[in-house]
Amino acid sequence: MGEFTTPTPGPVTHPTLVFEEYDLPNGLHVILCPSHSVPLVSLNLWYHVGSKDEDPKRTGFAHLFEHMMFQGSKHVKKAEHFRYVQNVGGTLNATTNQDRTNYFEILPSSELELAMWLESDRMMALEVTEENFENQRAVVKEERRQRYDNQPYGTVYENLLLRVFPTSGYHWSTIGSMQHLDETEIHEVQAFHKQFYHPNNASLCLVGDFKRDEAMRLIDRYFGVIPAGPAIARHPQVIEPIGKQVRHVMYDNVQLPAVYVAFQSAHAYSEDEYKLDIVSDVLSKGRSSRLYRELVYKQRIAKEVNCYNLSNEKAGMFMLSGIAQIGIDIERVEEALWMELAKMRADLADAQELQKVKNKFEAGYVRSLTEVGSRADHLQRAWTFKRNASLANGELQKLLDVTAEQAREAAIRYLTPEKAVVIHVLPKAMEPSSTDKS
């Protein structure tokens, strides 16, 4: 019998997005990323407009247009966009955040032209009418009631943004203000549409099973004829650092008290984004993470804990939270959160702990690259925020390269008590009466 030897593992290689990009004369940026593993194609269209680009006195417009875009265009009647796509076995949706609005279809590759026609028609000739506006204003107001105003802890995020980013467009949420929705007139909505929804403020990404030359021909046919829009004057985003701790108490329709601690963090594609991602995952990724292990299992003072780092185009927010167990003072939960942050600043994460969070991130990232829509989002985010789609191929390695010392250093620089916004959410039954306040 021959001698058995264990092969030496070689360097790990990760999937790479192979793509090309170009601009149409009207300013539309195009990214082509072919993949023939499955007979599907994703058309992913990003408009570089989010809630931060709105007038502070007229918030919620970017999200409003997430709805308005399905209300009909010159050749597509109201709600027909859904019917066309679903009738050929496709899916579609739209999302809005503080920096961009995303519209996408995933269809059988034989139906690529259908997606081109639908998206180009509403880019060229969306029906921004009084009737459509009134209809969708009512829909958005109801969405706000259900997802924010009538949801336990539903308005905490808005209150955090207001205090973490008091001087920039990041200080309101995408859903916008109910008052602003009520006061808005149709001419203001039309002006917002004219300002932002045109080829030179958009990027189109195709991912999946398509032929390059045919795709380029269709893009030119359907999008090349759309005229460019006006040059965009954006509101400057002034991110004033938090000089001392800000505290706030909210009384809400909740059963259990909660505490939220938030900090300004790093913007997208900065080196610190990846360091703070590691910190947040060490603290809360999985049930063996530090916050779960200490507050939920060991001390049994929290029913639920959470932590994340959200890096946007111009700024970021790092947030951690805990919901108290029955009978536990929320001050104990806050103190425990601060203790875990102090440990992050004082001590290095051990090698096993660090590798575990990296493994989870790596698995999730590689899994996302198996989906045509996720691949498009990776490329679009890099292009829209940094005008460099190639950054999408370096993100995973940047995170895997973060050392325990770099993570600790980021925690020291960003996550200190004097830079925090702290919100306690208490049951309304705990609110002092008017007599107590006097």
PLM segments and residue spans:
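Active-site SXXK
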Residues: T59-S73
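Short pre-active-site segment immediately N-terminal to the catalytic Zn-binding motif
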Residues: G50-R58
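Glycine-centered hinge/linker elements that transmit conformational signals in sensory
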Residues: M216-I232, R345
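Short, polar/flexible loop-turn hinges at active-site or ligand-entry regions and domain interfaces
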Residues: Q71-V76, M123-E131, D347-D350
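Short amphipathic alpha-helices in soluble, non-transmembrane regions
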Residues: W117-R122, R217-F223, V333-W338
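Non-catalytic beta-strand/loop surface segments
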Residues: M1-S51, H75-E111, R147-N201, V225-S270, ...
